[in-house]
Amino acid sequence: MPKLGMQSIRRRQLIDATLEAINEVGMHDATIAQIARRAGVSTGIISHYFRDKNGLLEATMRDITSQLRDAVLNRLHALPQGSAEQRLQAIVGGNFDETQVSSAAMKAWLAFWASSMHQPMLYRLQQVSSRRLLSNLVSEFHRELPRQQAQEAGYGLAALIDGLWLRAALSGKPLDKPLAHSLTRHFITQHLPTD
């Protein structure tokens, strides 16, 4: 008989082991056996909880996107009366949260983006994440700008966030957060009306 609460513990172990494996050897070379060994479980446990490697990648990305959502929402909830500029900076901060810019998370995101072009479930998950970012940005810009301008500014800031993140991920170096925040702050102030 399985122990109560073990499923969530096992899932967490396996997701963490997947992130470690992706970080060290990449998604393509990370095998179910390696991930199971890192998690200290049998390969059958992975099949039981996730079906296969793709199911494990999907669960890992759901976990990372959930952390992203929480990082953004926690910052926004701290600013209920915040200005559009403050709330836009909060969204930027959530996207550059440590849960999103650690080496393991960055490599997992890259593997996820590549896999999403070929796997419908991962594609849907990627689209939800992308739309959520754009919707949040446009909504905040729209507090100060007409709809069309808000959409353009939101799209531009989303591209800047993704571009800064991607450049850091591909460089193999940590994201330069002060520079990223400076560039995004400049973009935001250039697009919001001045008082």
From Swiss-Prot:
It comes from the Bacteria. GO terms for biological process: glycine betaine biosynthetic process from choline; negative regulation of DNA-templated transcription. Pathway: Amine and polyamine biosynthesis; betaine biosynthesis via choline pathway [regulation]. GO terms for molecular function: DNA-binding transcription factor activity; transcription cis-regulatory region binding. SUPFAM superfamilies: Homeodomain-like, Tetracyclin repressor-like, C-terminal domain. Residues 8-68 form the HTH tetR-type domain. The keyword Repressor applies. This is HTH-type transcriptional regulator BetI. It comes from Escherichia coli (strain SMS-3-5 / SECEC). The gene is betI.
